[in-house]
Amino acid sequence: MTAILGAGISGLSAGYYLLKKGLPSPPVIYEASSRIGGWIRTERFDGEGYVFEAGPRTIRPKGPAARNTLDLIEEVGLGEHVHPIFSNHVAARNRMIYAKGRLNMLPSDLSGVVKTVPPFTKPLFFAGLKDLFGGKSRKKLDDEAMYSFVERRFGKEIADYAISSMLCGICAGDAKQISVKFLMKSLFEVEQKHGGVVKGMLMEALGKKDKNSSKQVPLEGLAKRAKSENWSIYSIQGGLQTLPNRLKSVLDEGQVDIRTDVKCEEIEFKGNKVELRVDGEERTLDRLISSIPSYKLAKYLAKQHPILARELAAIPFVDVGVINLRFKNPDLLKQKAFGFLVPPIEKLPILGCIFDSCCFDMEDNTVLTVMMGGAWFRQWFGENPSEEQLLEVALKQVNQILNINQKPDSYKVNILRRCIPQYVVGHQKRVDGIKQYIRDHNLPLGLCGASYDGVGVNDVILSARVSVDEVVGTNKN
């Protein structure tokens, strides 16, 4: 018997991959809240033609992890319900940052690299030259903060405006804390090996050209369609919540027991078994997969495995305010785009804003999502801000930046506590140590979810698949 803690997208995916293994008995999934889907939260307003997304809303279609997600979507019968945004779509081409008192369009082609594009004071081409002729770092580094790495290789402007704002969008994090080795491992490694990013990428590309030609796995199905149609990003009709809902239906059909509103009380490892107590009920398991945040798992392991618990608890998380705004006017935005990000150097209380109605059809509505806080949540809002306080800040920023001064016709304020892990310098080393501890002690425990190997939907689904493969192995009891 296998149990899974958490019914977010990674926990449900783990259940799906376990079901595919054909074990003698289907797994059971325990979820502490009253709903499934985790941080994926879609609120639909079918009569009005729009949706609010409190969490992720789009998925990227490129790379091995993305292909795995596309395969899963097709396998569960959602292939015909995918809603792609093509690379020539305005939401794919137009991405902005708010800096120096104005919205600035980021370059989307090579022409933007050879001319000066605000907020930068010189062409981005010169940043590449700085890296190319900058020489090697004075000492070999095991890891480095993203900001430090980019400033060292490409200059302060790129670090301040491009990378810092990008990390606000990826993980609501501070580039001066986030690990380059974890988020951009290939760039970090080629820089350390070859003494520069541009030089290293060129040399690596030349060296691998012939090797890769014979190793390319042909794309099939939805992944092949995504490439041939040149998707930039995609969602699913009805909002991203459709994916966990569909996974639940598949698991229900496979007689997987999904229990919500339950409390995990104790985890104890005995030999090669796991003793799990949930709502006073004792279960003896062959294996346990945890998809809950690392700090929550740490509480249950502290008594028996304090060293492991300490490392799990050391992974930091941040709070994010997400404010959905809907206006009954489709023509409020002067610039059509995916949205904009705000670099921390601007010292504003928001991380950015997504133009949902530019990405997907919201009928005769302008729909925006304002994100705020993250690594700076307490600095701006204190410990316990009210929803009214966050709404007021969001509306003020929308007014100042987008010149929208009317009240929204509907809105939703979400205060998401400890929702995004921060992959600080040394994160990869910590995660490697956590997994090594589990192997060294032969614990029948698998880990998946955003705490460890990536925050995106693709990352957590792949982490579920890898975890299932690792914990099941040859033992199919």
Question: Predicted regions: what is each one?
Answer:
Residues 91-93, 125-266:
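Active-site/ligand-binding neighborhood in enzyme catalytic cores
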Residues 19-46:
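Glycine-rich FAD pyrophosphate-binding loop
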Residues 1-29:
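N-terminal Rossmann-like FAD-binding beta1-loop-alpha1 element of flavoenzymes
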Residues 42-44, 106-114, 335-337, 351-477:
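Conserved flavin/dinucleotide-binding core of flavoenzymes
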Residues 47-136:
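Dinucleotide-binding Rossmann-like beta1-alpha1 core, especially the glycine-rich loop
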Residues 10, 35, 295:
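Conserved Rossmann-like nucleotide-cofactor binding loop
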Residues 21, 260-383, 388, 397-401:
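Mid-domain catalytic core of redox enzymes
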